Amino acid sequence: MPIFKSQSNSIVQWIILTWVFLLSHAAVADQIKAIPWIKLKTESSQAKQICQALKVNCGKDVEVWKKQSGADTHLYLTDDTPQLIEFIKENNQYVVLNSWSFQQYQHHGRNSDFDKELNNDGLSIYPAFYPLNHQKLAIAVVKRWSTTYSGGGRAEEIADFVMLEPNHAYKLALADVAFHSYEMIRACFSQEEYQSSPHCHDESGSNLSIQFKDIGKEYYQWRLNFTDFNWEAFKPESSKVVEKSYNIVVPFQQK
C-alpha cells in the first residue's frame, strides 16, 4: 500500500505540473496582442521643431507617439504623406533610428464601388503595431473613402498590413483587409419626429479586431474578427443587430 500511495501522489503531482505548464503556455499565447500607440501632446510648433531636429521633411497633421506599454523609449512620428519615423531623444537631441515612406505606396485596397460612390481620402498609418512573430512587427496602411450626406455620411477603410524592415524597407504581409466602415442616414425630418423617435438615423458599420496565435511556424496565425452592426431608424438601441464572423490567415500566405 505505501508504494501504491507514493506512486499515486507522484502521478497526481505530474498531472498538476502538466496542467500548470499548459495553462502557463496558454496564458503566454493569450498575451500576444497588438501594441497600441499613445499620442503625445505636441503643439504644431513643437512638431515642426522635431521635424527640423530630425532633418526630415514633414507633411501636415504631424503626430508624435509612443508605445502604450513597456519601458521602450522609442518615439514615432507620422504625418499625412504618410510616413513613419522611429526616433529617440538622447542627451537632449533627437536621433532617427529608421524611417518608412508610403508616399508612393500602391495600396491593394481597390474597390470599384467605393471609387464610384465615394471620395478617395488617401492613405494613413493606423497607430498600432501588429506582431508577426517574436521579433517582426507590421503596421496597418489604411486607405479611406468617404462621403457626406445631409445629416449623415459614409466611410470605408481597407488595410494593407506591412512588415517593417531595417533601412527604410517594408514588405506586404497581408493585403486588402476590411478595417472599418460606418454609414449614417438621416431618417427624421420634422421636429415632431426628432422629439418622439428614439433614433433618428439608419446606422450600420463594421470593425476589425485581431487575435494572434503562435502555431510554431515562422509567422503567427491571425484570426480576423469582424463585428458588424445594423441599427434601424425609429427603433431603440436594444433592437440593434450585431453579427460576428471571422477569417483565419497567416501573413505572407494569402491566396
What are these regions (language model features)?
Residues 29-58, 152-255:
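Acidic, small-residue rich beta-repeat scaffolds with periodic aromatic anchors
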Residues 61-70, 119-134, 209-217:
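Structural signature of eukaryotic scaffold interfaces centered on beta-propeller domains
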Residues 74-77, 114-116, 148-154, 236-241:
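Short consensus segments that form the blades of beta-propeller domains
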Residues 71-77, 132-145, 217-226:
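Acidic/hydrophobic-patterned starts of short beta strands in beta-sheet-rich repeat architectures
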Residues 34-90:
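Basic/polar, acidic-poor N-terminal "presequence/leader" segments
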Residues 2-15:
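Bacterial N-terminal signal peptides that target proteins for export
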Residues 75-135:
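Short N-terminal edge-element motif at the start of the domain
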